[in-house]
UniProtKB/Swiss-Prot annotation:
Biased amino acid composition, Acidic residues: 636-686
Chain's gene name: epp-1
Membrane topology note: Single-pass type II membrane protein
InterPro entries according to UniProt: EndopolyPtase_N1, Metallo-depent_PP-like
Species in which this protein is naturally found: Neurospora crassa (strain ATCC 24698 / 74-OR23-1A / CBS 708.71 / DSM 1257 / FGSC 987)
Name assigned to this protein: Endopolyphosphatase
Post-translational modification as stated in the protein's UniProt record: Processing by proteases in the vacuole may be required for activation.
Length: 731
């Protein structure tokens, strides 16, 4: 048997028996064992289809429809927009903890039908299609959770079906959210009743050839452009640190482990077939120095897979967090020794991130991200670091390392804001490069094929035989090897740790060009347009001003209370003046577009550009005054200094200080520098506030410098719901 066939035989590995909640023994997951079979099991293209690729797709997430929502109800926590009198709008209570009224869902689908439907190639739908369990008076039940999911699935199918209503015109790729099950966050290993229900609800979306795989663990993929691009729907609930029903990705008996093995095998097959992949899921692999959303072992494997299959993976796309942002995976955070069992992984100082981020929690999280971004090393460009491009760095044994021109040390994950109006409802249209693909045969809604039935009858013993035949291969890449050795820590004696049964995927061939995540080419993400619905304008609510209440609040309220008050919505909980709702016409409008955003300056969505953006967001004003330059002598150092000065002008702006002197201990996330002509002291100033509207010590107004790209990023993170002056309080 050839080595390539042995490698492909890995498709049958690690799909052993998992006990279901009812004690039933599931069948093995059918996975293609050779390239021909894999190609035959996908939806076949229509040779003469009139439909062409547009180079766009829709990402929609966290709809949270709530059948109990009532307009003009109270936004208090005890009422949750279900009862009482208050400012809940017809289309939702913006900037609150209330869920989405059906009116918002219907209006969103109407807008998509009128403005988006005919211009996109596929839909990525990243879960949470049931309301939160936030009202003790109306607890959730399975019928409600499944009912709203079924309703939205039917609306999706109806919207994107052909004139007969029997076939989808474009593929829709859903995934499970942590609120799409009961109790929320907890999903036991499959097969189970939840996966069985969603197999039926999503029968139009999950390819028949992978139906059994989905029933087994809730993961699958769709070739949205046959033989060119696949969307992988990951069941991130098995990676989620708050899922008490499973235990991460370390043990072969865990569904998280099995899913990672499935993903590794499928990405290998994608590489062999010359295909690319977008990875999507609900819970993102968010991770800072103190917080995390995924189990650490799952995060480590996922990051390693991204690195080793960087020629295949285009990007990661996620939801859940409601805030618009991104994060960057650094290969130097990968601990292969830990994954291989050569290092202690029992100590992890990172705490599980809050299930639902408050404004304060989100601000803290974004500040930590910014701290991490300050450590990034942007890839060299023609105008900067030209010396690094030519010389390179000396690596192990004195060998010169090639400069990382494309930023392949890093990987990218994008997180979109939500439909549920925790801020403003939002959705995203992402564009990708279709150069040379304009006439490519497109996806079609395929009927059940005989091949899927045949795959389901694969013999379990054959899987085990293939597993035994495949030789363990450990990656010999210098950097991976160094990290492995770094993880080896055994004390005393001549005993050596047992060789682990851990397979590290092969990286791209050294002769391979950078993938679409790094170098502009077909299937590279070129940009996106972020849309939002300004519910403050659309709901058109005027509320009563209760001066007595406001005076009391302003006198007693701390800054923490002020931030938490946002969760009651834009209007607090004041009653509307007009008894009957009078909303304006519902519309989504452009919040920003990466194609023309003058501060983000993203030429496309390649990793290199995002690393540069993250680094610019992290920059702090320099202490001291700029040194004068002798124009009579131009050296490389002076040119570099001039470039730095231009960058300073580009990144920072002078703003008036507030009348109030804010007190806070020094930290690394200071965003302002005092500009005082009468003093030589130039210290970075940090901002906070001790009490929201209490009297404070007054000081003479001055000017400070702040990073306008960071402020711009924060504005979009909260979907333009927070005024600039208030954003300063978060920084």
């Amino acid at each position: 048997m050839s080595l390539s066939r042995c490698i492909l035989g890995l498709a049958c590995l690690w799909h052993g028996v998992i006990a279901s909640p009812l004690g039933a023994v599931p069948s093995n997951i059918p996975i293609a064992t050779d390239l021909q079979t894999a190609a035959e099991t996908v939806a076949q293209p229509i040779a003469n289809s009139a439909r062409k690729l547009h180079g766009k797709f829709l990402h929609i997430t966290d709809l949270h429809p709530d059948q109990f929502y009532k307009p003009h109800s109270s936004t208090d926590e005890a009422d949750a927009c279900h009862r009482g009198k208050g400012p809940a709008g017809v289309y939702g209570a913006e900037v609150s903890d209330c869920d989405s009224p059906f009116a918002l869902i219907n209006a969103t689908f109407d807008w998509i039908a009128a403005n988006v439907k005919d211009d996109i190639d596929f839909v990525i739908w990243t879960g949470d299609t049931a309301r939160h369990d936030s009202d003790e008076g109306v607890p959730r039940n399975a019928d409600q959770v499944l009912g709203t999911n079924r309703w939205i699935a039917d609306k999706m199918a109806e919207l994107f079906s052909d004139s007969t209503g029997r076939h989808l015109e474009i593929p829709i790729v859903p995934t499970l959210g942590n609120n799409d099950i009961l109790p929320h966050n907890i999903l036991l290993p499959g097969p189970n009743s939840w996966l069985q229900h969603y197999t039926h609800i999503w029968r139009r979306f999950v390819p028949e050839a992978q139906r059994h795989s989905f029933q087994f663990g809730g993961w699958f993929y769709v070739e949205v452009i046959p033989n060119r691009l696949a969307i992988f729907s990951l069941n991130t609930l098995y990676f989620f640190d708050r899922n008490a029903g499973t235990d991460g990705c370390a043990s072969p008996s865990e569904p998280g482990y099995k899913q990672m093995e499935w993903l590794r095998i499928q990405l290998h097959i994608m590489r062999e077939r010359g295909m690319k992949a977008i990875l999507m899921g609900h819970v993102p692999p968010a991770r800072t120095d103190s917080k995390k959303l995924w189990d650490e072992n799952c995060w480590q494997k996922y990051s390693l897979w991204l690195r080793q299959y960087r020629d295949v993976v285009v990007s990661g796309v996620f939801g859940h967090m409601n805030i618009d942002h991104f994060f960057i995976h650094d290969e130097r955070d990968i601990n292969v020794g830990q994954l291989a069992g050569l290092a202690d992984n029992s100590i992890d100082i990172r705490e599980a991130m809050d299930d639902e981020l408050s404004v304060t929690g989100a601000a803290d999280y974004l500040r930590e991200l910014r701290q991490n971004w300050a450590k990034l090393q942007p890839p060299p460009t023609d105008s900067k670091n030209s010396g690094q491009l030519k010389k390179g760095k000396k690596g192990r044994k004195g060998k010169k390392k090639k400069p990382d021109v494309w930023g392949e040390r890093y990987s990218l994950s994008l997180v979109s804001p939500s439909i549920v109006p925790n801020y403003y409802p939002a959705l995203r249209i992402v564009e990708y490069n279709i150069s040379g693909l304009e006439d490519t045969p497109v996806w079609r809604d395929a009927a059940k094929d005989a091949m899927s039935i045949e795959l389901e009858q694969n013999d379990r013993q054959k899987h085990l035989d293939l597993k035994r035949q495949h030789p363990s291969h450990m990656e010999d890449d210098d950097e991976i090897d160094a990290q492995k050795k770094k993880g080896k820590k055994h004390k005393g004696g001549d005993s050596k740790p047992k060789k682990p049964d851990f397979l590290i995927p092969h990286p791209p061939a050294k002769s391979s060009p950078p993938g679409p995540a790094y170098s502009p080419q077909p299937l590279t993400l070129t940009g996106y347009t972020q849309y939002f619905a300004n519910l403050t304008h659309i709901n058109n609510i005027t509320t009563e001003a209760s001066s007595a209440l406001l005076d009391h609040d302003e006198e007693e309220e701390t800054w923490v209370d002020w931030l938490l008050r946002w969760r009651k919505g834009r209007h607090g909980n004041r009653k509307p003046i007009h008894p009957k709702p009078d909303p304006r016409e519902f519309q989504f409008e452009v919040e920003y577009s990466t194609f023309n955003d003058k501060l983000y300056k993203l030429r496309d969505l390649t990793v290199k550009n995002y690393v540069e953006l993250a680094y610019r967001i992290s920059k702090q004003p320099k202490k001291g005054k700029a040194k004068s330059i002798d124009v009579s002598y131009e050296s490389a150092a002076e040119e570099e200094e001039e470039e730095e000065e231009e960058e300073e002008e580009d990144l920072f702006e002078e703003v008036e200080e507030t009348d109030e002197e804010e007190e806070q201990e020094d930290d690394d996330l200071s965003d302002g520098e005092e500009v005082d002509d009468d003093s030589d002291e130039d210290e970075l100033e940090t901002e906070t506030f001790k009490k929201h509207d209490k009297k404070k010590h007054k000081k003479k107004k001055g000017k400070k410098r702040q990073n306008k790209v960071w402020m711009h990023f924060l504005t979009h993170a909260f979907v333009s719901t927070v005024e600039k002056e208030d954003l300063k309080k978060f920084t």
